[in-house]
Curated annotation (Swiss-Prot):
Induction of its expression: By stress conditions e.g. heat shock.
Sorted UniProt keywords: ATP-binding, Chaperone, Nucleotide-binding, Phosphoprotein, Stress response
Gene: dnaK
Matches recorded under Pfam families: HSP70
Annotated S-S bridges: none
Gene3D superfamilies (UniProt xref): 1.20.1270.10, 3.30.420.40, Actin, Chain A, domain 4 (3.90.640.10), Substrate Binding Domain Of DNAk, Chain A, domain 1 (2.60.34.10)
Family: Belongs to the heat shock protein 70 family.
Protein name: Chaperone protein DnaK
């Protein structure tokens, strides 16, 4: 049996690993790098470039250089998150005939799995070059909170790349495998906080060790499939564009070449600010007008970056609370916190996570490589090369059937460990009913139509009887591959019908495509509801923080500003009681606009506090780095 390679197909970077004996090894690509940018470029002469070569030519070919495709995979074009990307991406995102988000590359319509397959092909080639033999099988990781459509699209990408995807596993689970495999960890409960380029996950995982065998059991998972480093970059890019417009009167958003240079510079500045207190974004000849060439030279401090992205970091905290609650644990039950994903290198992210869990995250896990290593370990488990490891993952959403009155009745609740099997007895709704329809659903909503439809089948031949008399046993069985088998049996006549719903493979192409479309169509309103809840949470946070700042500002806030802010707060509070997401966002925007003076006062107060703190510690501190950081930040504020 050949090697099963492990691939972390990331939004920003991808990584491939294999099992080399009992150890996982991350492989270097043709350019000598252990990670590969998830960037694909289609050149004018018909060449397809992947990784660093694609990144290098992006400035001169922005419309045909594709990045962050994982944010589009398995998504509908009308999704709000996709529409946001439409407005900021230099390439063209279009709606496919089936309503999915596709891309227009040099006039050709391309599906996200088709494009992601190019990255997977490079990962496959990297492994083949190292092993000196063909590679046909892989374990590919996905965010824990990816839905069926996104998982299936990822699997399709693997198939297009010439890989049989033996298992799709969740990124935090893979990171836990990488963390726990070679350590004498004993029995521990860990939290894996995974903030990557485009997605965020939190998983609570229990590692048990009995007689040398390690069991990795996922207790709960949560997340946000449209929150990541790309969003942080966008905030910084928008700030730089606005500053340049104020200074030069030119809006760079209309210049794709300038925006591509700015994207690279913003990403570089963000990375630098993880270790430095300030950096310069220096882009000579960024654009030109009638008066001649224009240059950008803007200082950005760590404090400024943090102020731009604080709400994004805070957005990751709510899923932590939900995951802990679902696991039935408190923060004191967590032994270790593991950070995964490049964006977790940001000091503010590390600080917020440490504050939430009351302990410092571990530093001995490589955030860029852990997921690929875990995928390789799972590949080793499947081939039998890795022994004494048992991985128990969970189903992220509840599974059930539609019952009388259009109600969703769950048979398997979310965060149930797989494999699992559950049966329940139902009956007929009408006298002498001879058949029942079993409609299989996925989701957390009470109304059946608000959940995702996974398929349906009929059970015929029920003997005539008064309503409520026949006994129909419905059984849900999920195996270790995440494949759902549903059966319905009339206990009186013995008649039975079955359906297999697979999140991986086995159905023919036409059936797979139909199920994906059906599931997406039925999940549309649920996505909108989730977005509304998310916006409400953001609105609540803004309401609370602004009121707190008004209170702290006291008499320093002019009466006119205070009146305007109070009015905007009341308007936002009213909007939060409604169901209109756009109205809530509009009121949040209005509040932000009238709160400028308040922000200035808050920043001044913060600077004064920092100055006092720096003066007090300057005489005593032994750690030069800390003193420098405090001193620099105060200087920037002044």
């Amino acid at each position: 049996m050949g090697k099963i390679i492990g691939i972390d197909l990331g939004t920003t970077n991808s990584c491939v690993a294999i099992m080399d004996g009992t150890q996982a090894r991350v492989l270097e690509n043709a350019e000598g790098d252990r990670t590969t940018p998830s960037i694909i470029a289609y050149t004018q002469d018909g060449e397809t470039l992947v990784g660093q070569p694609a990144k290098r030519q992006a400035v001169t070919n922005p419309q045909n250089t594709l990045f962050a495709i994982k944010r589009l995979i398995g998504r509908r074009f009308q999704d709000e998150e996709v529409q946001r990307d439409v407005s900021i991406m230099p390439y063209k995102i279009i709606g496919a005939d089936n309503g999915d988000a596709w891309l227009d590359v040099k006039g050709q319509k391309m599906a996200p799995p088709q494009i992601s397959a190019e990255v997977l092909k490079k990962m496959k080639k990297t492994a083949e070059d190292y092993l000196g033999e063909p590679v046909t099988e892989a374990v590919i990781t996905v965010p824990a909170y990816f839905n069926d459509a996104q998982r299936q699209a990822t699997k399709d990408a693997g198939r297009i790349a010439g890989l049989e995807v033996k298992r799709i596993i969740n990124e935090p689970t893979a990171a836990a495998l990488a963390y726990g495999l070679d350590k004498e960890v004993g029995n521990r409960t860990i939290a894996v906080y995974d903030l990557g380029g485009g997605t965020f996950d939190i998983s609570i995982i229990e590692i048990d060790e009995v007689d040398g065998e390690k069991t990795f059991e996922v207790l709960a998972t949560n997340g946000d499939t449209h929150l990541g480093g790309e969003d942080f970059d966008t905030r910084l890019i928008n700030y730089l564009v606005d500053e340049f417009k104020k200074d030069q009167g030119i809006d760079l958003r209309n210049d794709p070449l300038a925006m591509q240079r700015l994207k690279e510079a913003a990403e570089k500045a963000k990375i630098e600010l993880s270790s430095a207190q300030q950096t310069d974004v220096n882009l000579p000849y960024i654009t030109a007008d009638a008066t001649g060439p224009k240059h950008m030279n803007i200082k950005v401090t760590r404090a400024k970056l943090e102020s731009l992205v604080e709400d994004l970091v805070n957005r990751s905290i709510e899923p932590l609370k939900v995951a802990l609650q679902d696991a039935g644990l408190s923060v004191s039950d967590i032994n270790d916190v593991i950070l995964v994903g490049g964006q977790t290198r940001m000091p503010m992210v590390q600080k917020k996570v440490a504050e939430f869990f009351g302990k410092e995250p571990r530093k001995d896990v490589n955030p860029d490589e852990a997921v690929a290593i875990g995928a390789a370990v799972q590949g080793g488990v499947l081939t039998g090369d890795v022994k004494d490891v048992l991985l128990l993952d969970v189903t992220p959403l509840s599974l059930g059937i539609e019952t009388m009155g259009g109600v969703m009745t769950p048979l398997i609740t979310k965060n149930t460990t797989i494999p699992t099997k559950h049966s329940q007895v139902f009956s007929t709704a009408e006298d002498n009913q001879s058949a029942v329809t079993i409609h299989v659903l996925q989701g957390e909503r009470k109304r059946a139509s608000d959940n995702k439809s996974l398929g349906q089948f009929n059970l015929d031949g029920i003997n005539p009887a008064p309503r409520g008399m026949p006994q129909i046993e419905v059984t849900f069985d999920i195996d270790a591959d995440g494949i759902l088998h549903v059966s319905a049996k009339d206990k009186n006549s013995g008649k039975e019908q079955k359906i297999t719903i697979k999140a991986s493979s086995g159905l023919n192409e036409e059936e797979i495509q139909k199920m994906v479309r059906d599931a997406e169509a039925n999940a549309e309103s649920d996505r909108k509801f989730e977005e509304l809840v998310q916006t409400r949470n953001q609105g609540d946070h803004l309401l609370h923080s602004t009121r707190k700042q008004v209170e702290e500002a006291g008499d320093k806030l002019p009466v006119d500003d205070k009146t305007a802010i109070e009015s905007a707060l009341n308007a936002l509070e009213t909007a939060l009681k409604g169901e209109d997401k756009a109205a809530i966002e509009a009121k949040m925007q209005e509040l932000a606009q009238v709160s400028q003076k308040l922000m200035e006062i808050a920043q001044q107060q913060h600077a004064q506090q920092q100055a006092g703190s720096a003066d007090a510690s300057a005489n005593n501190a032994k750690d030069d780095d800390v003193v420098d950081a405090e001193f620099e930040e105060v200087k920037d504020k002044k």
